[in-house]
Amino acid sequence: MHYFFIIVIWLLSINTAWADCWLQAEKMFNIESELLYAIAQQESAMKPGAIGHNRDGSTDLGLMQINSFHMKRLKKMGISEKQLLQDPCISVIVGASILSDMMKIYGFSWEAVGAYNAGTSPKRSDIRKRYAKKIWENYRKLKEMSAEEKNKRLSIAVNK
């Protein structure tokens, strides 16, 4: 996993347009950019600097609302809270890696998408289902858009 984030930082340091972040994440994790975008819509309403405070005392950071639970691991890999808040591309890549981890548990399924937000506890199955339904609605709308409109939205999201 350590090498993964070294590669991510290297990829982000090359002169790549921000709009390519979604496509980079898609290629790195084999997760559709539209699905990642649908999650970002739900998580932060496309606000890269969003901060969410949870009842359990944890905090969600950035465009993909990365939970502070992950910070110990991310800091070891050179990723800070500040980067998650200020660099939407890093947020997208980290979010995709977390979703990929959930897919290793649940397979490529809506249960995995729900676990992105609600975690893996058996007690949170209903929450996972409700969350996944919201993402499905966002995703369905994106899939119905023209390629031009979709590209415009993806570009705006990381340039805010």
Swiss-Prot record:
Q: Does the keyword Nucleotidyltransferase apply?
A: no
Q: Which InterPro entries match?
A: Lysozyme-like_dom_sf, Transglycosylase_SLT_dom_1
> What keywords are annotated for this sequence in UniProt?
Signal, Virulence
Q: Pfam families recorded for this chain?
A: SLT
Where in the sequence is the signal peptide annotated?
1-19
Keyword Signal among record annotations = yes
Q: Which family does it belong to?
A: Belongs to the IagB/IpgF/P19 family.
Protein name, please? Answer: Invasion protein IagB
